[in-house]
Structures are given as C-alpha cells and as structure tokens.
Amino acid sequence: MRKTYINGLGCISVQETFDTIFLEKAEINENDTILPVKTPVYKDFISPVAIRRMAKGVKNGIVASAMAMKEANVSTVDAIITGTGMGCIEDSEKFLKAIIDNKEEFLTPTSFIQSTHNTVGAQIALGLQCKAYNLTYVNGSISFESALLDAKMKIEEEEANIILVGGIDENADYTTSLFKLAGFIKRENEGPYKVLNATTKGAVYGEGATFFVLENEKKSTTYAEILDVEIINKLDVNEVESKCSAFLEANGLQVSDIDTIVLGFNGDVEFDPYYKILSENSFKNTPQAFYKQLSGEYNTASAFGLWVGAKIIKTQEVPEIISVNNLEKPAYKTILLYNQYKGIDHSFTLISKC
Amino acid sequence: MSRGIAITGMGIISAIGNTVEENYVSLVNNKMGITTIENISTVHSGEIKVGEIKKTNQQLVAELELSPDNNFSRTAMIGTIAAKQAIQEAQISSINEYKTGLISATSVGGMDMTEAHYYDYFEDENLVKYISCHEGGDVAHKIADELGLKGMVTTISTACSSAANSIMLGARLIQSGKLDRVIVGGTDALAKFTINGFKTLMILSDGYNSPFDDNRKGLNLGEAAAYLVLESDEIVKKENKKVLARVSGYGNANDAFHQTASSENGDGAFLAMEKALKVANLKPEQIDYINVHGTATPNNDLSEGRAIVRIFGEEKAPDFSSTKPLTGHTLAAAAAIEAVYSVLAIQNNVVFPNLNFQTPMQEFNLIPQTTLKHKNIEHVLSNSFGFGGNCSTLIFSKSE
Amino acid sequence: MEALKQELKEKIIDVLNLEDIKLEEINDNDALFGDGLGLDSIDALELIVMLDKDYGIKLVDPKEGKVIFKSIETMAAYIKENRAK
C-alpha cells in the first residue's frame, strides 16, 4: 500500500507560525477568552481584485495553502480537501443579520456565497485553476481528520500523488457571543485561563488555517509519514484507553512505542478527563504535549495539533511551552495525537519519522 | 467482476412523499410537490414556490417521539426519518455488529433554528439549547444517536453536490475495507437563509421550474432527506441480503471557473462524468438513463447540456430527465434523493419524465424524456453540481 | 449628470470593496466589466441591488445589467431615465 508523507506545512494561527521555526515566538495569553489570528500580509499572496470579497477564513486558507505548497515545492495538486466546523461564519452572520434586519429586502449575494462551507477549498481551486477532486468536511472537531482520512485513502487508491489538506475556522462576533451564552466559551473575569488543571467549564476560543501538502513520496522537505487516522463519534471516558490501545495495536504498536502523545486539552473541566485518563495512566511515562493554550479551541484546532506533531518530528524537540510533563526522549520517532470536543468527535492520528 | 458496492436499503422524505413507495407513486404519476410555502413565514411567499414537506416541526417531533427538551433542527428531524427507513429496509437490527459508519451531507444544518431564534437567545433561556444545533455535524450526530450508531460519523458540505460526495466516500470506505457498512445520504430543510440567498443570485423561478427548456427561468428550492445503506459483499453474502442496486461509479471534479456559476463548456461536469464512467468501467453508450442535475437555471442546464454533448455526442445522448420539477432543488440532499430515484428507475425499469418541458434549447439538440418510459435499465448516471464549481457524478447499476 | 456620475463612482468603490481604486482612476467611459475594472457577475448582482435600494429601479433579469453597467456613462444615463427615487 502506498504511503502518505507530510511534505509541506502552512499555518496561520493565534501565534506567529509563519516565518518562524517552531513556536520560538509563541506567547501564552491567559487573559482573554477569544484569541484572534496573527494576520499575514494578505496582499503578498492574493491579488487586490480577488481579495476584496474574501472572508477572513478564505484569505487565511489561501495564504496557509500557498505556504504549504511553497515549502513542499509543488505548483499543482491532485486534490484539495478541507475541513471546517463552521465555515466562513462571519459572512453567514452578516447575511443572516441582513435578512432579519432588512426584513428580507435589499440583500446582496456576496456574503451568502462566502457562507457556503466549501468556499475556501473552492477559492483555492479557482486560484490554482485546479480542476481536481475538491471536498469539504463539516463535522465538529473531526472536520479536519475527515479530510486527512480522505486524503490518505486517495493516495492509497493511487488516485492522487499530491494533495492539499487543511483545516479552517474563524471567529465571528455574534457567534462567539452566543457561544459564551451557551457556555462553550469561558466566562469573562474568571482568568487566568489555564488549560492544564482548569477548574472552570468551557474553553478559550481561537481561530486559524492550517494546511498540509501530502504526497506519496518522501523528499527533502518531508516532515513525517501519516500512519493512520481513526474517527469515532462517541466514547465514554472509560472507553478511551481501550480504544487507544486497539488503535495502536491495529498499527502494530504499543504504548511504549509512542515517543510523544499530543493531547487536545482545552481547559474545560467537564471534558478534560478524556485526556487525563490517557495522561495519568497508559501514557504516564511518555512525553506529553498540549497546544490549545497557544491555538485556542476551535473545530479544526486539531490541524494545529498535527502541525505541532509534524514539527516535533522535524526539529526533534518538544518545546517547553507545549510540554505537559517535561519528560524527554532521546529521539522522537512516533507520535500519537488524540482530540475530542465535548465528549464527541474523537480522533486518533498516528505519524512517524521516516 | 463485481458491479460495485451493494445498496441494501433506502429511505426518503420529500415534497412528493414520506416514504420510498410514496415517492415512486408520485414519480410515475407526475405528482409535483411544488407549492406555496407554508411552514416558513417569508416576504417572498407570494412570488416563489417551493418543494416543501407538508409537516410542521411539531408533527415531526411527534413522529420521532422526541422528548420535549430536544434540540433537533428540522434538517436533523427529516434526516432521522429517512435514515431510519433505510435501516429498516436493510433489515439491520444490531447496528454496531459490523464496522458501521454514517456519512451525512447538509448545507444549511440547523440554520432553520438559528434564523428563527437568532436575536432571541439572549431573551429566552429555553432557546439556548438550539445554539449547538447550528453546525452541520450536529445533524449527523443526532441521526447516529437515533440509530444507536457508534463509529465513524462525518459530514460533507460541498453545496448542492454534497450528498453525491457522501455516497462516493461511503462506497470508497467499503471498497477499501475500512468499513463493512455505511449509511450515506443527505438532508436539508428549507430556510429563509437559502431562500434569500438564491434570491440574491436571481436564480429562483417565479413559477414552476422547467429544466432544459429554452424559456427556463430558474429553480424552485425544496427540502428533503434521503439515506442509503451500503454494505460489503461479505455481509450481503453472509446474511443473504437483497441488493437493490449497486453504486458502480463515482467522480468529483472542480470547474475552477467561478464561485457560483458553471463554465460555458461544463468542464467540471465533463470531468466528473468521465471519471465516474472510468470507475464503473462503462462506455457512455452503456448508460440507459441520466438523472440530470437540471436545476432549470439558465446557466446550469446550458453547462450541463454541453458536458453531456461532449461525453455522449449530441445525437447519442441517452434518455435523460430532471426530477426537480417534482421535488424542487433540495440542495445538499439532492444527490441522495436522486440516488433513490436512480435505484427506483433500475428496479422498475422506467425513465421518469422531465415535467414542464416545452421548448428545446437553442444551443443544442438535447430533448429530455417528457413522459414515463418503460425499458430495461442497467445503468443510471446521476449528476449533481454545486457552488464553488463542485461537480459530482454517480453511476448506479443493476445488481445481476 | 456629473454629480450623479461622481456619486456612482463613490458607490461602486464602496459597495464592491474596491479600496485600492481611486475615484479619479475611473473614467466615465471605462469598461466596468471584463478588461476594464475587472468586475464580474457577482458584482453585477451587487449593483442590481444598489439600483433598487438607492434609485428605486428594479431589474428582473440579470442579463439587463450587461448593457446598463457597461460604463459609468451608461449607468448614469439609465438611472437618470428610470429612477424612482
């Protein structure tokens, strides 16, 4: 069966993740409940005529994908597969508000068009004039992993050699106010918002666009091989460990083979037990990393997690800022990622050095 | 050689019927489901017609026996109804007995609830439960929970081709051995959001949509849900299951032309059909019926027609029809609805009529089948195209 | 008429987010679509709404826009002839 390699990365996030090596400029913000992305200079990547109607998510997606392609040194791809939990929600908001406020009159199409979930993938295709396979997944916190799994299958089916895969989500004011109301986002004035050992419900929200160029061949820019991806809709806390071992076993591995486990801790006291059970039991002696203190929580934050995993393998270090337990290994070869959101949409992703 | 992935169950609820059987009766009796809108209050109700499921949300809640504190969107409710029917026809009693997945599709998700309560959430705490039902994935989770399914659950949203892509992914997951069984399809309820969105694009008809007619004036929106059960040949053999038809071909390509419009020559559509034929290992002349996307917008039918001419030749195009005059355009669900109709065409050896057609288009000599036609149907090709140039083609084949 | 043309230029820049284009760069007879300003069919739909909202002119067929929105000159002439507000 053909293998899948990560050959290029592009990341627009709350941190400075472009023009940097690996989180050396990262800063933890424990005072805010909403973290905005550090924006690149869009006009370096997108023409003024094209940019004027683009949503934030579209712009970030285009820039992140261009960075990934540049790093992988590819100019065309055989498939574009994206994941997004909410799509370009800012435009959805704009259109919906206009409908209500203007009583369905004098509406214009631009924000409606942008609100379609596949708009990022479509605009990347338009920019690249890429007529290939183009899909978008929208399923909460496994939106990105669905795209990743599809891409891996495409390479295994020998239907594609070079694939652009990415996760994109954006914050929008009214939606975040609703998420605060519903308790998904932490309350104000309860900071500092620490992700580990948190005592309050909800999470600090972020946004971002993280893209990967996947190829069937190893080359000088290769970060890691993607060994496997598994998606499960629902698990009880006490099922996580057995599911995790079954996943490793299916790949001929055991816990001791894992050099770092990257966990999706988001500081929600209600659901972090899903990570704790792995952190405090099977993987007690394994180096552990966490990242949502840097990226914030969002539906496709796990794409940022995979970016972290790939960088660990490439740089052979787990920066202190993401280390859970300060354990080290002489070499970082095999990395397991686990993520879930509110007890649903669980994913296990396995990558290794090659 | 196998003719593709087995379909062992289907379920549907649309403007022309609440079951597969009811839909079939409407299809063969030209019973259009396009009417004035009743369940949504909109200022456009006098000037547009829609394909609406004539059941209120309260009726749907009662039918599904949901608890009073449920937070189901209409999209999730009609999706659950269709998925349950599909499971029943496939005679699945223990859903997690095999590696089973659900690949859903939606474009609006829970928008119907979001738009109904948008500014009221801060006023009424009883509404807050609906905030989480906005996103697309919520619909799939609700359906999976109602079916008791634990496994791979995901959702595709590529506008109006969404469900075709969910059927395609489901077939690939079985083909690759990742899953033994997968429930695939899509659901979209009518919403003010989409009604107004399509209105801004000026592609809504003020009358009844007339696909491939020279005087076509645009589409009627509709709402519907349909799901199909795909199973591996191992299960089919072991449990001696009845195979309704097979998913034999699939293809997706991007038009890469415009954010909403299709290209003049239908490049994306051409590539999608070409790919699906290749996967099915069929020649164009082996296709007996095309269920076209046929939305009746000036742009779609011209682009799709040109792509059909390129694949089949102007004089050799097989019988084709759009069933959207009956159901309306049901967006992310459309390809699942039309997958059910394609299977019905195969099972009953019929070509469904393309209603409301009068005048051939000037650009080419393609005339849809306008009356019910009985003939042997081995292979049906079904097209679905969406915004963002997303073009998908599925091919369904008789099992034996 | 000159004032109307100036007004249209301002509105086009605003409605279509043409922030990089200056008022004086748009000539009255420049093509707005295609090679000129580079506007496309979505812009045309935006302009149709502007006609309705600001001048009370309702177009039912988007194809009509092709002729009306040829240039600032043609737009101004059409609005002058047909405006309801």
Functional labels for PLM-detected ranges:
Chain A
Residues 1-135, 145-149, 153-157, 168-354:
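Conserved "HGTGT" condensation-loop signature of ketosynthase/thiolase-family condensing enzymes
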Residues 140-143:
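Catalytic nucleophile serine of serine hydrolases
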Residues 159-161:
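Alpha-to-beta junction loops
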